[in-house]
């Protein structure tokens, strides 16, 4: 797991606004991302892809500003472009083209001269595990191989930062773990990464910081590395009886954080000073039966649920989970 260590912020957002066809898509994004690997989360339509496209210069900024590695995306486009590598979610290869030719072409488009671009194409394809298949046509590749080829073209020119859009999408467990291992290795080499994914487990396994978008706004920014070091426990409770909402309110008054789910289920973040017996005692006082209590597998799941409940209306939750 990587830890944030660079003095230069990965991304600084200051009221960033983007309108497409007159419709607001990004609505005043503000926040500082300093991690080595930052997870970008949000439901469909939250603005994740629009944010990537804006950072890459595909969409103009309508208001506010954004700085990537200290470079203003509106005024430093030429100096910023060689610093970024982009792995899109959708297929981006050219049918009939070999992997090495494709990666070489992308490296040239990123600014490398032809000869160094070819050398880096071979290196990148060997690095991701496609060395033996580098002369094969991309349209004969499996889905997992195509994903690796997209990663190779993103790193071939030696960027300082990667934007990865759903890099494990559609992969089987083995290929998924291979991709995540590569992401961690790349980050450990000093390359900064923003990883957009709908798979919370992938984000939790790779990222030291996370930003969650909702309805084009920042719902929360959290330090996952600090959360891993904390002693808080994450529980899931199945309850029956009692006045609706009384038990969650009592837990909040105790210092817990609570997300209410369907069918009277609760996700609860319990501080170190509170023991499980106290949860049962308060349930009894509220006339609530705790029918099941189990440890939750994911602290990030709590964060995401809380952000979806409370974020996105102009207020930003930066308190973690």
What are these regions (language model features)?
Residues 56:
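Helix-to-loop junction immediately C-terminal to a conserved catalytic motif
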Residues 178-269:
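ABC transporter nucleotide-binding domain
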Residues 64-75, 79-80:
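Conserved ABC transporter NBD signature motif
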Residues 162-166:
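Catalytic Walker B motif of ABC-type/P-loop ATPase nucleotide-binding domains
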Residues 43-47:
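Walker A (P-loop) phosphate-binding loop of ABC-type ATPase nucleotide-binding domains
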Residues 104, 108, 115-133:
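Conserved ABC ATPase "signature" region
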């Amino acid at each position: 797991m990587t830890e944030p260590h660079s003095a230069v912020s990965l991304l600084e957002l200051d009221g960033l606004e983007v309108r497409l066809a007159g419709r607001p898509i990004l609505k005043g994004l503000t926040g500082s991302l300093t991690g080595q690997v930052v997870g970008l989360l949000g439901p469909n339509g939250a603005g994740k892809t629009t944010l990537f496209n804006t950072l890459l210069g595909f969409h103009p900024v309508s208001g506010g500003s954004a700085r990537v590695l200290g470079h203003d995306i509106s005024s430093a486009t030429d100096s910023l472009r060689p610093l970024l590598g982009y792995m899109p979610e959708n297929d981006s290869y050219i049918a009939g083209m070999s992997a090495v030719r494709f990666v070489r072409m992308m490296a040239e488009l990123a600014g490398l001269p032809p000869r160094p671009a070819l050398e880096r194409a071979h290196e990148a394809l060997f690095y991701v595990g496609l060395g033996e298949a580098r002369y094969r046509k991309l349209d004969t590749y499996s889905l997992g191989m195509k994903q690796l080829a997209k990663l190779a073209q993103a790193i071939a020119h030696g960027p300082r930062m990667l934007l990865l859009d759903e890099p494990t999408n559609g992969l089987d467990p083995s290929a998924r773990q291979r991709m995540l291992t590569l992401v961690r290795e790349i980050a450990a080499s000093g390359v900064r990464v923003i990883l957009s994914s709908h798979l919370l487990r992938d984000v939790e396994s790779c990222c030291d910081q996370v930003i969650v978008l909702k309805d084009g706004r920042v719902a929360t920014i959290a330090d996952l590395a600090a959360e891993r070091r904390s002693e808080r426990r994450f529980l899931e409770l199945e309850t029956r009886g009692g006045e609706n909402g009384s038990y969650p309110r009592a837990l909040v008054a105790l210092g817990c954080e609570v997300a209410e789910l369907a069918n009277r289920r609760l996700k609860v973040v319990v501080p170190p000073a509170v023991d499980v017996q106290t949860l049962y005692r308060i349930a009894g006082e509220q006339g609530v039966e705790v029918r099941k209590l189990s440890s939750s597998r994911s602290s990030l799941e709590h964060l995401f649920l809380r952000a979806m409940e409370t974020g996105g209306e102009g207020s930003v939750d930066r308190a973690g989970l």
